UniProtKB/Swiss-Prot annotation:
This is Small ribosomal subunit protein uS7cz/uS7cy. Keywords: Chloroplast, Plastid, Ribonucleoprotein, Ribosomal protein, RNA-binding, rRNA-binding. InterPro entries: Ribosomal_uS7, Ribosomal_uS7_bac/org-type, Ribosomal_uS7_CS, Ribosomal_uS7_dom, Ribosomal_uS7_dom_sf. Belongs to the universal ribosomal protein uS7 family. PANTHER family: RIBOSOMAL PROTEIN S7 (PTHR11205). Coiled coil: none annotated. One of its GO terms (cellular component) is chloroplast. PROSITE patterns: RIBOSOMAL_S7 (PS00052). One of the primary rRNA binding proteins, it binds directly to 16S rRNA where it nucleates assembly of the head domain of the 30S subunit. It is found in: Plastid, Chloroplast. Part of the 30S ribosomal subunit. It comes from Ipomoea purpurea (Common morning glory). It comes from the Eukaryota. One of its GO terms (molecular function) is rRNA binding.
Length: 155
């Protein structure tokens, strides 16, 4: 048994303009080579583009997109008796949000075009509507978990 105490949960900080933790999560995940100011520029331009496209509150579109992509169950590879099984496990809201942000950014990067702000805004609007690559990824994960439900007792 470990003698160390359990680590305290760190709360995510909010971004300077919108005072929103989800925006800060996006900024920290989009970050490359330590260029945080560039990451902020990309996110803020994407938020402006969402405002222009939907003519609604862009933060509510962002929340709706992340809520739509967030999974509540995922699969984890588990080795049992020489064979590897995909075992479905339930995940918490924090881990689910982190996965959702990761999937949204991956789907945005895959989209055609040069401007990341445009690609991200398009993906967020699509995800809020219930379509797009990130939603497809969530559905695929849920299908995988449902198919491997028989291995749930390996948890």
């Amino acid at each position: 048994m470990s003698r160390r105490g359990t680590a305290e949960k760190k709360t995510a900080k909010s971004d300077p303009i919108y005072r929103n933790r989800l925006v800060n999560m996006l900024v920290n995940r989009i970050l490359k080579h330590g260029k945080k100011s560039l990451a902020y520029q990309i996110i803020y331009r994407a938020v402006k583009k969402i405002q222009q496209k939907t003519e609604t509150n862009p933060l509510s579109v962002l929340r709706q997109a992340i809520r739509g992509v967030t999974p509540n169950i995922t699969v984890k590879a588990r080795r049992v008796g020489g064979s590897t099984h995909q075992v479905p496990i339930e995940i918490g809201s924090t881990q689910g949000k982190a996965l959702a942000v990761r999937w949204l950014l991956a789907a945005s990067r895959k989209r055609p075009g040069r401007d990341m702000a445009f690609k991200l805004s398009s993906e967020l609007v699509d995800a809020a509507k219930g379509s797009g690559d990130a939603i497809r990824k969530k559905e695929e994960t849920l299908r995988m978990a449902e198919a491997n439900r028989a291995f749930a007792h390996f948890r």
